[in-house]
Amino acid sequence: MAQGTLYIVSAPSGAGKSSLIQALLKTQPLYDTQVSVSHTTRQPRPGEVHGEHYFFVNHDEFKEMISRDAFLEHAEVFGNYYGTSREAIEQVLATGVDVFLDIDWQGAQQIRQKMPHARSIFILPPSKIELDRRLRGRGQDSEEVIAKRMAQAVAEMSHYDEYDYLIVNDDFDTALTDLKTIIRAERLRMSRQKQRHDALISKLLAD
């Protein structure tokens, strides 16, 4: 069976990364593509399901996982830990399923060091004006918060050239098509096709 591919996807807040990933997943069968499920020490919110939205663990369990290098990456955010389990990712990839990991550039760097065969995609907004409009469109942040988010976005975007692919999300449907095209092209790579069609190739080349 062909090994699945891990896709690292990064973008500044407001670029449409999460919406694009969710739209992609709706067009792909579950046995082809899944999104990575992280471990966290924070308490579940209403409606969240263990193993579907997050793997909920306590601080001691999380620190034990850190001690045995169980995470591809991990970080502490507002007193809670979040991390991506190497074992959980590898188990899904071994079944031939592609996995999408929505993460910032710092986490992406950690993962590339441990899984150099992962593919990475960076998503840009079409302009600063459009990014500002999208951030304001949420209608939930003050001017100070928006300014801080914009500064963070610029810092995040400065790492765009560390990635394998670049998508500019000007038109959502076009950006989604670009994302699908990347996935299709990766699945047609010789290494994956040889594994997938091993039996056919053997028969075709038999005397």
UniProtKB/Swiss-Prot annotation:
SUPFAM superfamilies: P-loop containing nucleoside triphosphate hydrolases. It is found in: Cytoplasm. One of its GO terms (molecular function) is guanylate kinase activity. GO terms for cellular component: cytosol. Pfam families: Guanylate_kin. It catalyses: GMP + ATP = GDP + ADP. Transmembrane segments: none annotated. Keywords: ATP-binding, Cytoplasm, Kinase, Nucleotide-binding, Transferase. ATP binds at A11, P12, S13, G14, A15, G16, K17, S18. Residues 4-184 form the Guanylate kinase-like domain. It comes from the Bacteria. Its main location: cytoplasm. Its EC number is 2.7.4.8. Belongs to the guanylate kinase family. Essential for recycling GMP and indirectly, cGMP. NCBIfam families: guanyl_kin. This is Guanylate kinase. The gene is gmk.
